[in-house]
Amino acid sequence: MKRKFTLAATVFAAVMNLSNAALAGANDYLFEPVKAELQKGSGVVVTVRLVYKPTGKPVSDAVIFSPRIDMSPEGMATMAAPLTPVTGGEPGTYSFKTDLVMAGGWLLSLSAKVQGEAETVTGKITFKATN
């Protein structure tokens, strides 16, 4: 009897674990700035961290696409700057080199495909460029 109960409990735990993974979605991920305030200028490196919210752990090896940085927080969405991906850094961090030509608020928008996740993860992160 005890053996059947133990087996049933093990199966139940495995099913619950699988169902939680199956219920994971794009909303379970969060892009956050590594440093929210940056010095304005050319060749500034902007770094974000992709986090799996249920565990708080960084997500490595995501495929990042459609990055864009502009001054929409300042009402100047057409004031965009080029972004160049930068390799290296801590696991779960994604960096871009850009030119923050003006002080003020900048918005980084980007999307990611996470391995095993059907939905696309999107993020909008605000940075402040200072003099």
Where in this protein do the model-derived segments appear?
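Contiguous segments within soluble domain cores/interaction surfaces
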Residues: A24-N131
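Positively charged n-region of N-terminal signal peptides that target proteins for export
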Residues: M1-F5
